[in-house]
């Protein structure tokens, strides 16, 4: 595949029409591999000897955030410099010149920023329920399976199986296994078609890695943040709550909060992160398993604005729906409040409405202050609590995206983001969701063990 990718890069320099296979904006492993494998197959089988160029729909600088992608590319010996990223090709200019044909893989909806490219879309291959209102008017192939790589495998094996080499087979095989959580029937992500094509790949290439080995390796790489900067760790799995000009980032971090807080120059990095991205506050949710294989969750609220920080902390501490069961943890910075979260069943998805509530309470207080730039500076905790009472009995519904962000495209089911708003099919398993499922399994096993010992 390396020679093919070099040909793709050379084709970018030619003044000729291009066929581009574009993955989704999350660029998770499924999206990346599906784009690579499908473009490679289409190039090999093109009667007109056209070249189909796989484009990873992120900036090159963002690839390190996707540890499983980086690991797998190294594992199958595909050099990163050979890949083509979204910031290295001007799709709009190509389209305006009449030189672009676009194939969407692992998504079927273009974001508002790419709306002009819809006319260039010639085909869609996706594994989520179709949204007719937004889907491009072209050939659309959609089937509810656990991994889009399964549909790419099917296309290859039904069309021209002789074109499939071991390197591409390894990419598809590992991706399906990761997406389908090692084909675990208890989790229920894998469909019969996913299982069928994993078995067919293993039959064609018996030396492919054992399922458990490749799943464990990819899963470990996916959660590994050891080589990331603080900003990369915060951006790796992040959502944003936005309300009337106030923005709060919520980042999932897969390590012990104690270790995170001991990072060199952490508070400088947190301040820079909030300043550079115009966040008024940052909520870090740390998630990991302890030595007894029990799930542990912790919270850290970083905010230089005292009134906003007190409001967020007050709402979280007082929350009963859901109850977080927070225990304060000492902090070395006055701008950061840390907690141990006793209720490990409260995921980020469940926390988002509580944070929306906190923003509403803060903005209500700001209105009462009538024009003060910093609300209630010097206000006592008891006074803040009185204001919080007005909002503490109800949760504010709404999206957890910036108001400027388009609600589309839906994020992939296996990406690092929590949920796809259009997906009503197979269960969604993000990194956060996989952790939550594993937590439930771990707790269930512990309960059974206690029962059997009685």
UniProtKB/Swiss-Prot annotation:
The modification Phosphoserine is found at residues 400, 415. The modification N-acetylmethionine is found at residue 1. Its cofactor is Mn(2+). Residues 397-420 are annotated as: Disordered. It catalyses: diphosphate + H2O = 2 phosphate + H(+). Keywords: Acetylation, Cell junction, Cytoplasm, Hydrolase, Manganese, Metal-binding, Nucleus, Phosphoprotein. Its main location: cytoplasm. Activated by magnesium ions and inhibited by manganese ions. Inhibited by dipyridamole, moderately sensitive to IBMX and inhibited by vinpocetine. SMART domains: DHHA2. InterPro entries: DDH_dom, DHH_sf, DHHA2, DHHA2_dom_sf. The modification Phosphothreonine is found at residue 411. Mn(2+) 2 binds at residues 30, 106, 179. Gene3D superfamilies: DHHA2 domain, inorganic pyrophosphatase (n-terminal core). One of its GO terms (molecular function) is inorganic diphosphate phosphatase activity. It is an enzyme of class 3 (hydrolase). Mn(2+) 1 binds at residues 28, 106. One of its GO terms (cellular component) is nucleus. Its EC number is 3.6.1.1. Phosphodiesterase (PDE) that has higher activity toward cAMP than cGMP, as substrate. Plays a role in cell proliferation, migration and differentiation, and acts as a negative regulator of NME1. Plays a role in the regulation of neurogenesis. Involved in the regulation of microtubule polymerization. Homooligomer. Able to homodimerize via its C-terminal domain. Interacts with NME1. Interacts with GSK3; at focal adhesion complexes where paxillin and vinculin are colocalized. Interacts with alpha and beta tubulin. Belongs to the PPase class C family. Prune subfamily. This is Exopolyphosphatase PRUNE1. The gene is Prune1.
